[in-house]
Amino acid sequence: MIPGEILTEPGQIELNVGRPTLTIAVVNEDDRPIQVGSHYHFAEANNALVFDRELATGYRLNIPAGNAVRFEPGMRRTVELVAVGGERRIFGFQGKVMGALK
């Protein structure tokens, strides 16, 4: 073993298997790039991102942990979201949930 080496099983690692997902279109209406991280509650992302926030409540980006998606100014892109797991409680961000999801 090499210090810091990560040993994984052969094959592909599947993320978020069995969790509900949804695909939404997002537009950055700001004049600056906006980046959203993998575990950020997407409905509370930067207000310059235009999308169906009610639909996105309780979801985050369906990307590997530690990654982010960058939205360039004026850019429209489609992203896949995955339901927040665990106890499905959200605190912080813009303070719009502050507890259990309904």
Swiss-Prot record:
Q: Which GO terms describe its cellular component?
A: urease complex
Show the CDD domains listed in the entry.
Urease_beta
Catalysed reaction(s)? urea + 2 H2O + H(+) = hydrogencarbonate + 2 NH4(+)
Q: Which domain of life is it from?
A: Bacteria
Q: In which pathway does it act?
A: Nitrogen metabolism; urea degradation; CO(2) and NH(3) from urea (urease route): step 1/1
The molecular function GO annotations come to:
urease activity
Q: Which terms under GO biological process does the entry name? A: urea catabolic process
Q: Matching SUPFAM superfamilies, A to Z?
A: Urease, beta-subunit
Q: Where in the cell is it found?
A: Cytoplasm
Alphabetized Pfam families for the sequence: Urease_beta
Give UniProt keywords alphabetically. Cytoplasm, Hydrolase
Q: Does the keyword Nucleotide-binding apply?
A: no
Give the Enzyme Commission number: 3.5.1.5
| Chief localisation class | cytoplasm
**Which NCBIfam families would you find in this protein's record?**
PRK13203.1, urease_beta
Q: Which family does it belong to?
A: Belongs to the urease beta subunit family.
SUBUNIT field: Heterotrimer of UreA (gamma), UreB (beta) and UreC (alpha) subunits. Three heterotrimers associate to form the active enzyme.
Record protein name field: Urease subunit beta
Q: Which organism is it from?
A: Bordetella pertussis (strain Tohama I / ATCC BAA-589 / NCTC 13251)
Q: Gene encoding it?
A: ureB
